[in-house]
Each structure stands twice: as C-alpha cells, then as structure tokens.
Amino acid sequence: MRSGIHPDYHEITVIMTDGTEYKTRSCYGEPGATLRLDVDPKSHPAWTGVQRMMDTGGQVAKFNKRFAGIGTRTK
C-alpha cells in the first residue's frame, strides 16, 4: 500500500443497546474511541420481527408542519 493515502485503522469499543461491549477495528474516531449504538441487530425491527414506529424528537410532526402547504395549490 502507498503510505499517506489510507485512513488510520485502529481499535475501538462498540457498545450495543443492551450494554454489551466488543472491540473491533475501524476508521471511526480516534484509537480507543467508543461507539454507542442506538439500533443494533438485537433491537432492529428487520431482525426481531417486531414492528414499531420510532418518532425521535417529533421528526414526522416537524416534516408534516414544514411541508403542509405543498400540493394544496388551487387554480
């Protein structure tokens, strides 16, 4: 490999939603950084089969408010 063109690849700690931790190598952050997951295979609907709507911080309401007038144009 050519030197100086590749990102730093180092060990980080990943914390799953249930608190379990594991070490992996990544370009994320700095050496020894911690990556805390909001959604992982143990809690994601695609892998658990449980369908749930997650509206974090009212994002759907904010979208609806912002674009409420679009498409209601009269001639």
Curated annotation (Swiss-Prot):
Keywords: Ribonucleoprotein, Ribosomal protein, RNA-binding, rRNA-binding
InterPro entries per UniProt: Ribosomal_bL28/bL31-like_sf, Ribosomal_bL31, Ribosomal_bL31_A, Ribosomal_bL31_sf
GO molecular function, one term: rRNA binding
GO BP, sorted A to Z: translation
Entries under PROSITE patterns matching the protein: RIBOSOMAL_L31
One CC-aspect GO term: ribosome
UniProt family annotation: Belongs to the bacterial ribosomal protein bL31 family. Type A subfamily.
Assembly notes: Part of the 50S ribosomal subunit.
PANTHER family given in the database record: 50S RIBOSOMAL PROTEIN L31, CHLOROPLASTIC, LARGE RIBOSOMAL SUBUNIT PROTEIN BL31A
Role according to the record: Binds the 23S rRNA.
Protein name per the record: Large ribosomal subunit protein bL31
Species this chain originates from: Gluconobacter oxydans (strain 621H)
